[in-house]
Each structure stands twice: as structure tokens, then as C-alpha cells.
Amino acid sequence: MITIKKGLDLPIAGAPSQVINDGKSITKVALLGEEYVGMRPTMHVRVGDEVKKAQVLFEDKKNPGVKFTSPVSGKVIEVNRGAKRVLQSVVIEVAGDEQVTFDKFEASQLAGLDREVIKTQLVESGLWTALRTRPFSKVPAIESTTKAIFVTAMDTNPLAAKPELIINEQAEAFVAGLDVLSALTEEKVYVCKSGTSLPRSSQSNVEEHVFDGPHPAGLAGTHMHFLYPVNANNVAWSINYQDVIAFGQLFLTGELFTDRVVSLAGPVVNNPRLVRTIMGASLDELTDSEMMPGEVRVISGSVLTGTHATGPHAYLGRYHLQVSVLREGRDKELFGWATPGKNKFSVTRSFLGHLFKGQLFNMTTTTNGSDRAMVPIGNYERVVPLDMEPTLLLRDLCAGDTDSAQALGALELDEEDLALCTFVCPGKYEYGQLLRDCLNTIEKEG
């Protein structure tokens, strides 16, 4: 067991009941283009086209051969683009049950499949996009290989579901997915989990590792740091546990599996719980009548790293297993910093709230202050468990010093790894975006 001592479990109210419920009927789904780092689409469909489930919607010009497929059967009703014609979303109205089918195999055959057979089926089905590289967090090139694949079978994000509930419900498919991954990599598959019991693969190159401690103990970046540190030459891939289940279902049934179990939770959700829905589901429909009155913000993903689900982005993200809802923090509080703060949370124990152990807070979207200088008071060191100098790294990200940032470990990181630094920062810096700008520069300039 690897125990993480530094970090922070956010004491936010509205945790979900850990029972899986059926979600609302969904009539619209979407693929969100901006989720895929560096992707430039070649469109295969236009508004008005009828599509089958698993039919190709677009391919990536920059990553030749990588295909993005429809999670449902229906009709393309919107292709939304932003500034410089960046693809925002392809929206599909759900209709019918036609689908593209693929080869299916017996469970005993999976570990012995040729890598090319596995790769071809994953690419054609669109499930290849479930894999992401580290560094850079991009969909891997089709011809690339890796010596390490990390399966994130735990989740320490605030308000998250317990993965073991979902995995044990789909035990056969999860093991089948691990067998597929074991044949896909040159060396090891690392299944990173909490202390709970999970279905196990019998393949010798599939290893289980237990992590314990506060968030970010459940992030792929943390697991890689301790088990297989990445750099420009050591590239690892990561995948979440629900996509492993989808891999298994694809090879066992020959059909694209797009079910998702997500946590619908937050301080303003009437009945926080786990709901079964589909990949890319409309969050306007999924959250309809689920929230308390007032102005709220629906977030696809965690409250720390998720995206504001509004307009053309109001759909469940490809890599998101949560839907979080917070009240918009519009109210101004005169001299709020000078009040005792019984109902306020503070990492630095500036308010009385820290005296009440176990207290949960109705957190909002407010940043509790305006932008200001980066102040190194030890906050970052409290929440970063990795063997690096977070204050120096964050300073370099602010200054745009990519050489120094790379030397300090920036290539190991993804936006989610710095989310707690953003949360505890007195200067209100968005370190995730600064990291992405740095990584883009490093990749472009070599």
C-alpha cells in the first residue's frame, strides 16, 4: 500500500447516496470537441444526417486514423463551432437503435488476441479515444506503444461515486477489459485502487496497487509518480474504470457500450445519488427538476476540475464520471474576511469553521476575493503529495518559464493534478490553464 499524507478531501455538502438509480430519459447527446487536446476534426457528417450508434462522426487531422464515433443512433441536429471555427460540439437527437457491430470473442480468447486486432477494433469503434497519454494528456497515436497502462479504479474527487459498486456490477466486462489492455501494452497494466476488493485479471502483467489517503490519492498522475514516473522518453497511458468496462463489453458482445454511471451531487441537489445515463448525455435533461430554486452552476465533472455545462457545452464530458451542481456565489459580504466564519471553510484555519470536525460546507462558485499576487505561504506544499517543489513550479508556470517548469516535473502533470493548488491559492490563479499553456509550448518547441 502507498499512503498519501498530503492532500485535501474537500468538506463539501451534498455527497451522493451510493446506490445506482436509473436516470432520466435522454433525447440529446453530444461529443465535445474541446475535450481532446490538440484535436482538429475532419467531419464525416453534417446537420440533418442520420447516424447509427458507433458510426464515425469525425476524425483527427493531427492524429491520423483516430476516429470519434456516435454514442447513440439518431440524427445530427447541431454542429457547434467557436472562435476560429474550433469544434465545440456535435449534437445528436436520439432515435432508433441501429448500430455498427464488431467482432466478438470468448473471454478466454481476449488475452491471446493479436495487438493489431485489438487496436483495429478499438479505433473503429471509437473507444481508442478512452486512452490518454502522459505527458500531454492526448489520445495516443495509433502506431504508438507504451510500457505502462494505468487503470484508475478509485476516485477521491469530491462527491464522487465509489468505483467498486459500478465495477462489481460489471465484473465480467471489467476483467475482460483488463485482459484486452494486457495484450495492448508491451509490459504492465497497473490497476490502482483503494483497499476494497475488485475482480482480478489472471494475466501476469496486470498488477494491483493500493493507494490510501486524501485527494489526489486517486488521480492517475499520483499513481504514475510513485509507480512509473513519466517524462519525454517514458510515456504512460491512462484509462478510467468505466472505459475498461466498455472495452470488455465491446469485445464480449461486439457492440459499443456507452452506458455511464455518474454521481449527480452537490449542495443544491435535492436528492444526491448515482444515476445511470449515457455518454455525452444532455445535462439540461439529466438535471431537470433535480436542483433547489435559485441561480446554480451545473458542472460536468468534479467541482475542482470540471467544465461549466452551458450552451453548446451542456453535455456530459467524455472523461467525466460526475455531474456537480453549485450555487452561483453572487452575494457580496461586507468585511467577510473579518467575521468569525463559523460556516466558512479555510485551509489556513483563518475561520472558526475548522474547529467543528466533520462539518460540511455549502460551498458556492465564489472565489472569496479578487485576483492578486501569488503568495507562497505553504498552502501548495500541504496539498501536493508528489516529490517536487510546487511553489517553484507554479511560479515558473506563471512566468511562462517552460525550461525550468519542465525541469521541475511539469511533464508529469495534467490540469487535474494542480486543481487543489488552484483551490488553495490566495492569488486566485488558474494553474491548470497555465500548465496547459506550458505543455503546449513544450510540445510545439520540443
UniProtKB/Swiss-Prot annotation:
GO terms for biological process: sodium ion transport. The keyword Signal does not apply. It catalyses: a ubiquinone + n Na(+)(in) + NADH + H(+) = a ubiquinol + n Na(+)(out) + NAD(+). Its EC number is 7.2.1.1. Pfam families: NQRA_2nd, NQRA_N, NQRA_SLBB. One of its GO terms (molecular function) is oxidoreductase activity, acting on NAD(P)H, quinone or similar compound as acceptor. Keywords: Ion transport, NAD, Sodium, Sodium transport, Translocase, Transport, Ubiquinone. It comes from the Bacteria. NQR complex catalyzes the reduction of ubiquinone-1 to ubiquinol by two successive reactions, coupled with the transport of Na(+) ions from the cytoplasm to the periplasm. NqrA to NqrE are probably involved in the second step, the conversion of ubisemiquinone to ubiquinol. Belongs to the NqrA family. Composed of six subunits; NqrA, NqrB, NqrC, NqrD, NqrE and NqrF. This is Na(+)-translocating NADH-quinone reductase subunit A. It comes from Vibrio vulnificus (strain YJ016).
